[in-house]
Amino acid sequence: MNILLAVDGSPYTQRMIGYVAENDEWLGSKHRYTVVHATPPLRGVGASGVDPRELRAIYRNEAEKVFKPIRAFFEQRGIAANFVNLVGPVAESIAKRAERDSCDLLVMGSHGHGYLVNLVMGSVATKVLAGCKVPVLLIR
């Protein structure tokens, strides 16, 4: 199975990884894992004076902070995983990557906001569900 794990470094990411760890059938060399972290692009005044190379380094460093404990999780279990930093609209970037990689499943944590909050503000999980053609498993 080709599994994409969308991570953001939040406690919900930790819960998702915990769920994967507790369910042995999710782990193993028979699966292919891609771990993605998506960052919205810096725009406006903050981005205008920054060298594009420096900006890419900033995005990469932020993603590495999120990836570090997850990379350790996979390495401790002897499981290979591909780590990808995406820069763009978060939900759209995650959904497109899952489709591009022909993933069988996209797994992500969810904050579990209520209907009203999602209706007014939206959420990454809600947007991924709406825009992704790949099956999505939300862990709360």
Give the label of every model feature segment:
Residues L105-A130:
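Glycine-rich, Arg-bearing micro-motifs that act as flexible, cationic patches
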Residues M1-G49, R77:
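Small/aliphatic-rich secondary-structure junction motif
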Residues M1, D104, K133:
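Conserved acidic residues
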Residues V134-R140:
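Short, flexible loop segments at boundaries between secondary-structure elements
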Residues T34-V36, N82-L86, L137:
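General small-molecule cofactor/ligand-binding pocket signal
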Residues R53-K65:
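A short acidic, glycine-rich active-site loop
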Residues A72-L106:
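Structural beta-alpha unit
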